[in-house]
Amino acid sequence: MSRDSQPVTITGIGSVSPYGPLAGLMANAPLEPTTISAWATAGQRRAFLVPPFRPAAVVPGLKTRRLDRLSAWALVASSLAFKDAGIDLAQLDRSRVAVVFATAFGCIELTEAFYLSAAANGWHGTDPITFPETLASAPASHVAMFHGLRGPNVTVSNKYFAGESAILQAACIVRQGQADLAIVLAGEALARTLYEWYEQAHLLSPACYDANSQEAAGFIPSEGVAALVLESSTRMQERPEARNYARIISGRWAAGGHAAEIIRKMLSGSGPRLAICSSNGEPCAVSSTSSLVREVAGDDCVIAPPQAFARGLAGTGALFHFMLALSKRAGSPHGSELALMLGTTRDNGFAALLLELP
């Protein structure tokens, strides 16, 4: 996605997270993991969990009885994002509204239940109604059906950069005229099998087991769904009252290669003053992200490190990294500036977005 195309603007934010269901930015407040009680554990196990709530109390008329929590959260987060953007879908051509969803594990709770039922009862003993909900694209389908959206519908998955990939995909869809606006969602729900897999892979922080332990290597698993509304420049001209959280200027994603060289070309001489670290699973300070920021943006670029909650969302934390960085930025005086949102992997892979913040 190059700088030659018209920018796409982020005009609405919604989320379901350990902070609860929210429209707009989350509070810039400390967040502590809670003890898992949804399943039996051998000793204390902690994670950043979404507190129980009734989706219909947030979005009147919403029915979620047969849905996985991930799909229910996607419906709530998308509704809150549209509300925050001030968009009345009844006034739009809904065939021009795209849905892009990012997930690493999909509807893991119903998938877990389906396969455990098959293991216990055989394939003939499984519930056929449950099977469609095991598809990773189920949340995006539910969002489209609930809101009556008939534009492009895409689900992406990536080990490291699913969230960034979703933003890039949605921005390209809007820029290429395939849609006038897009709702971008990313997130995960925690289940016993996923948490235990993290343990077996030795990926977890000591803080998962001891509240007094300092977080070091590893991460604390998280759950939640974030949603962003992206609008075209044409629509923004028709909506002067629309909120502007950020303009997406350009972006790149690569599985390898010379990251610094590619990002410099993307920046085209621009000097971002803020870097939003979107590294997942490890602290920004000990990842390659900080050194790459210094290489392409210099020592004067302020690095906004990710919060532990966003790092625990596998590859889908990018939207929360962005939202939490904006929340922190809102508490201090500032002017318009360029920001580089950057995530890296150990094998030279990276995802980068150049943003203009108001």
Q: Where are the model-predicted features located?
A:
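Conserved "HGTGT" condensation-loop signature of ketosynthase/thiolase-family condensing enzymes
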Residues: 1-152, 164, 172-176, 187, ...
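Internal active-site segments that recognize and position negatively charged phosphoryl groups
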Residues: 169
